[in-house]
């Protein structure tokens, strides 16, 4: 099963109180693997499948940590496109007791990679034009 799309760090600030613009309230801040493709892959792994990730991750310390987290979960990262010039993508959200207040998706590395994340489907690692991938694909609907 291929999971194509965003794999990034989710940074989530959660307050247990309602929030309005400008509020400063106590809460918890967490960081964990996330992104559409990552969330799908983690779900598939829980059902005993071994998802293959096609994505872009910065070749930096945060990216190394993210790839290690994926590997530890049993996800295949052998075909992830890594760029030493770009940082690992992140998503930051603020949530209150009433739900999402605001979020920012910094997916510039995935956007910069473009169709390079699909190279394994053409260069023989996962398929070629003559012998295309015939398995299932979960595709991040946010890709352009």
Where are these regions (language model features)?
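Positively charged, low-complexity intrinsically disordered leader regions
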Residues: 1-19
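Long alpha-helical scaffolds
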Residues: 26-27, 40
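Catalytic beta/alpha-barrel core
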Residues: 138-143
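Histidine-anchored nucleotide/phosphate-binding helix
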Residues: 38-45
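Conserved N-terminal subdomain of the carbohydrate kinase-like
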Residues: 9, 21-24, 31, 46-136
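Short glycine/threonine-rich catalytic loop with a Thr-x-Gly-x-Asp
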Residues: 30-33, 37
């Amino acid at each position: 099963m291929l999971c194509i799309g965003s794999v990034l760090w989710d940074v989530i600030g959660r307050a247990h109180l309602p929030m309005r613009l400008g509020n400063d309230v106590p809460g918890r801040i967490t960081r964990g693997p996330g992104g559409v493709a990552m969330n799908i892959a983690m779900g598939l792994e829980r059902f005993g499948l071994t998802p293959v990730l096609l994505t872009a991750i910065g070749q930096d310390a945060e990216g190394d940590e993210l790839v290690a987290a994926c590997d530890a979960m049993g996800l295949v990262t052998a075909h992830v496109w890594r760029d030493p010039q770009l940082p690992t993508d992140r998503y930051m959200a603020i949530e209150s007791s009433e739900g999402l207040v605001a979020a920012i998706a910094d997916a510039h590395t995935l956007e910069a990679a473009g169709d390079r994340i699909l190279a394994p489907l053409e260069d023989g690692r996962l398929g070629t034009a003559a012998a295309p991938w015939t398995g299932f694909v979960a595709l991040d609907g946010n890709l352009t």
